[in-house]
């Protein structure tokens, strides 16, 4: 029995026609494209290589091979959309009637090799897979994928599309090869693609999204030492310690306990015995600069109203937990920044709350907050009062030095507070000077000289970082002269939880990007224009299709490396786009927090009897700070994902001209990244194996 090629695309068009005629295969009328003859070859000749499977064994997938010498199919350029692939697969093929499809009860007994391309695509979609185009060079890969899914029995009946910003490659890699053609484009099916494909980047109605809060799911298994979760407003640290992390998710914060509101004379005692203000005091300098004069507050409020997102859009695109946070912020801006929360600021004296208040009052004498935290709260209150025009907290005039408002105002560019401030790009940071070529160690490693004086950390940034480190209890090395903090040591450390996130992303550098559309939604227009991976122009694809392909194994290996390089760059673009989503949402929330803290300071300084309003504002600011904290970890994850895919791209760039087989190249490219060197210790193993063969 003759052996037919598994990948007939390597044959010329005339050779394909002669092989089909020699084996009694009827050719279609007229001159057809090469893909049509490749498809006929696969259906009628390649299928003869495999003996028919006995009944009852269709659900078992083929054995997985891990040999380095196994020749892998070379992906071809194709459209990244599933519908475009569906239209191409139908070219030159007899249309399949609906009545020809197998019955529901017979689908489990079908041989995947007998399915048409369209039926195979439908089966993969039913199992929750979003495949690329199915052509001759990719069909075998998808057949194996379908067999594995049927064996696992994980068919997904869901018809709701995932709200992803762009397509990500499926984890169908074998010996390092995957469906890289999802990011490629072809000249076929361009006109039909937009009609057939329903964009997965459209805004998903809020009713179709889950309303269960995330509960800080990203923080499961991640904890900061010596930095405990701040308690709800009006509670002590010991009481809050009993409530944190008693389940997998974070418990919802309780409303404020009804108490007699203190006057100005009682404010010191209130600040020293209860944790009224949860936010770290690292933001008070920025808040002071934002509100250098109380008369400018209405202008800032109006600017914030004009730039904040509309709550109606957020209602349709955000899950319950994040919708509440962002809606509360936007609601305060729409009402002229009067952030009163009925369930928190207007407190009822119900029996459960009364019992908690009684327990709180009984424990005040023995469960006082620690002196460092009390001092931090006191300093923070002082900063708010100074900002509002009051000298300091009564009885604590010496607790902190007076703030130099003039110097702060000199550092502020007044043009930054115009209506275009929030949407304007940030100032560019000067590039660090590079060492000379002689001082570089090896490769593309770049070392940096000491930062010149003009590029040192600004006094404003130095103040914020130093203040944050002090609040978090992190020590910083100091110079002996002038008692100033050394700029080279003034930095935040890489905490073990952040390093853990980076390590997880680098362990599998080609993993699929998680969807962030529910937590950080954007409109479909912005997602298509900014966040989607750019498609290759049709003119460029036309030039590529006209080029004569070079023969030989080395040429095929180089072409595969080029496609994998393009795939890695597309993934890096997706990760960077996701980080952009997160940064955009974080900027809006942080801007609203500035206005909230500024208004709370004005309330405390002008009318202490309205302290409950300030507490309501700070309570919502706490929620916004939690949102920003979790968003920061998501942004770390996206940054690590971008670094991993950039590393994969560089690996294929260096490997494409190496004289090793394609399987070894793919294995080296997918090796877990550890930093330092591009490939790590895996290179020695491959070189030894290759040396033994020779």
UniProtKB/Swiss-Prot annotation:
Gene3D superfamilies the UniProt entry points to: 1.10.287.3160, 1.10.720.40
Gene Ontology molecular function terms on file: cadherin binding; DNA binding; lamin binding
Intracellular or extracellular location(s): Nucleus; Chromosome
Residues with PTM Phosphothreonine: 57, 74, 154, 160, 164
Pfam families in alphabetical order: LAP2alpha, LEM, Thymopoietin
Region spans: Disordered: 47-117, 150-209, 338-368
Residue numbers bearing the Omega-N-methylarginine modification: 86, 88
Expression tissues: Expressed in many tissues. Most abundant in adult thymus and fetal liver.
Domain LEM-like: 5-48
Keyword Nucleus: yes
Biased composition (Polar residues): 155-178
Domain of life where this protein originates: Eukaryota
Ranges of biased composition (kind: Low complexity): 78-93
Residue ranges of domain LEM in the record: 109-153
Self-association state and partner proteins as the record states: Interacts with LMNA, BANF1 and RB1 and with chromosomes. Associates directly or indirectly with lamins at specific cell-cycle stages. Interacts with CMTM6.
Listed name of the protein: Lamina-associated polypeptide 2, isoform alpha
Species of origin: Homo sapiens
Lineage, opening ranks: Eukaryota, Metazoa, Chordata, Craniata, Vertebrata
Annotated gene: TMPO
């Amino acid at each position: 029995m003759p052996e037919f090629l598994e990948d007939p695309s390597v044959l010329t068009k005339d050779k394909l026609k002669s092989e089909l005629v020699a084996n009694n295969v009827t050719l279609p009328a007229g001159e057809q494209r090469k893909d049509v003859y490749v498809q006929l070859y696969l259906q009628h000749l390649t299928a003869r290589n495999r003996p028919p499977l006995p009944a009852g064994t269709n659900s078992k997938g083929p054995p997985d091979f891990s040999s380095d010498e196994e020749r892998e199919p070379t992906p071809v350029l194709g459209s990244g959309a599933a519908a475009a692939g569906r239209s191409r697969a139908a070219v030159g093929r007899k249309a399949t009637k609906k009545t020809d499809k197998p019955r529901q009860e017979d689908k489990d007994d079908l041989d995947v090799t007998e399915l048409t391309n369209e039926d195979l695509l439908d089966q993969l979609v039913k199992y929750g897979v979003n495949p690329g185009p199915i052509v001759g060079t990719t069909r075998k890969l998808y057949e194996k994928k379908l067999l594995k899914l049927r064996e696992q029995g994980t068919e997904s009946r869901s018809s709701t599309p995932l709200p992803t910003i762009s397509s990500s490659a499926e984890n169908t890699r074998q010996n390092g090869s995957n469906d890289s053609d999802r990011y490629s484009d072809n000249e076929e099916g361009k006109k039909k693609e937009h009609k057939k494909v329903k964009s997965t980047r459209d805004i998903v109605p809020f009713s179709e999204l889950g309303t269960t809060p995330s509960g800080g799911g990203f923080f499961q298994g991640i904890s900061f030492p010596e930095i405990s979760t701040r308690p709800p407003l009006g509670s002590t640290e010991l009481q809050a310690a009993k409530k944190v992390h008693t389940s997998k998710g974070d418990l919802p914060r309780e409303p404020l306990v009804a108490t007699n509101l203190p006057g100005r004379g009682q404010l010191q005692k209130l600040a020293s015995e209860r944790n009224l203000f949860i936010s770290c005091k690292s933001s008070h300098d920025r808040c002071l600069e934002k509100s250098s004069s109380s008369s400018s507050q209405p202008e800032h409020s109006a600017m914030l109203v004009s730039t904040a997102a509309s709550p109606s859009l957020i209602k349709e695109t955000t899950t319950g937990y994040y919708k509440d946070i962002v809606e509360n912020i936007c609601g305060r801006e729409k009402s002229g920044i009067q952030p009163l929360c009925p369930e928190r600021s207007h407190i009822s004296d119900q029996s459960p709350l009364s019992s908690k208040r009684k327990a709180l009052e009984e424990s005040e004498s023995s469960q006082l907050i620690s002196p460092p935290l009390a001092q931090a709260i006191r300093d923070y209150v002082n900063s708010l009062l100074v900002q509002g025009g009051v000298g300091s907290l009564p009885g604590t005039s010496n607790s902190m030095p007076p703030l130099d408002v003039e110097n702060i105002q000199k550092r502020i560019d007044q043009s930054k507070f115009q209506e275009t401030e929030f949407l304007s790009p940030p100032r560019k940071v000067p590039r660090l000077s590079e060492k000379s070529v002689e001082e570089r160690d090896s490769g593309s490693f770049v070392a940096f000289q000491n930062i010149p004086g003009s590029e040192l950390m600004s006094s404003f940034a130095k103040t914020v970082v130093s203040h944050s480190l002090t609040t978090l209890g992190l020590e910083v090395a100091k110079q002996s002269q002038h008692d100033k903090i050394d700029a080279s040591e003034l930095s935040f450390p890489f905490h073990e939880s952040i390093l853990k996130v980076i390590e997880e992303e680098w362990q599998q550098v080609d993993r699929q990007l998680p969807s962030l559309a529910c937590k950080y939604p954007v409109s479909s227009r912005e997602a298509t224009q900014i966040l989607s991976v750019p498609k290759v122009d049709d003119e460029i694809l036309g030039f590529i299709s006209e080029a004569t392909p070079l023969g030989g194994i080395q040429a095929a290996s180089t072409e595969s490396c080029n496609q994998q390089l393009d795939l890695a760059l597309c993934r890096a673009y997706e990760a960077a786009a996701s980080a952009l989503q997160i940064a955009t949402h974080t900027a809006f929330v942080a801007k609203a927090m500035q206005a909230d803290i500024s208004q709370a300071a004005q309330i405390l300084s002008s009318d202490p009897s309205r302290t409950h309003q300030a507490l309501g504002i700070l309570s919502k600011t706490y929620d916004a700070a939690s949102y920003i904290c979790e968003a920061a970890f998501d942004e770390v994850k996206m940054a690590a994902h971008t670094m991993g895919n950039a590393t994969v791209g560089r690996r294929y760039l260096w490997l494409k001209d190496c004289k090793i087989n394609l399987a070894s190249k793919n294995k080296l490219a997918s090796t877990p990244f550890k930093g330092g060197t591009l490939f790590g210790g895996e290179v020695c193993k491959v070189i030894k194996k290759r040396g033994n063969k020779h």
